[in-house]
Amino acid sequence: MHIVPEAVMKDMIKVYKALSDESRLRVLNLLFEKECCVCEVEQALEISQSKASRILSSLYDAGFLGLRKDGLWSLYSIDWTGMEPYLKDILEATRKGLKGNRQMKADRERLKTAVRAGPGCADKSCGVKTEESVAV
């Protein structure tokens, strides 16, 4: 019998909680396509900036996302290289499961027209975390 260490169990709980929300799955669906800033997520999902920020922060904290700064923008992407192998398996299964969903397809279509030059980006509210806050 294989016993899962307590720390791994806590990480797994955080991961499954992150995946247990439709909005977070919709954001992952976008990030499977390309890296995004908060305002692109906001536009593609037709949600508020604060909700997009909270979702990205939750997915980042669960270990799914990487972050890089580019001028005004904090750009989020799936962090395939820094991810634990079991997380990669979970995300691949999630990606396959979302592929044919009508809502997910519509979100991906809206992402194609989302722009990084929106009001959220212009006032620098596009990023949730900065490189400095991640390093702390």
Predicted feature residues:
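C-terminal regulatory/oligomerization modules of transcriptional regulators
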Residues: M1-V8, G82-V136
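Alpha-helical interaction segments
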Residues: P5-E6, S50, G63-L67
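N-terminal helix-turn-helix DNA-binding core of bacterial DNA-binding proteins
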Residues: K10-K51, W73-G82
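A general structural signal for well-ordered secondary-structure junctions
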Residues: E22-L25, C37, L65, M104, ...
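Alpha-helical residues within the helix-turn-helix
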Residues: Q43, Y60-D61
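Residues within the DNA-recognition helix of helix-turn-helix
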Residues: I55
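Beta-hairpin "wing" of winged helix-turn-helix
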Residues: D61-D70, S77
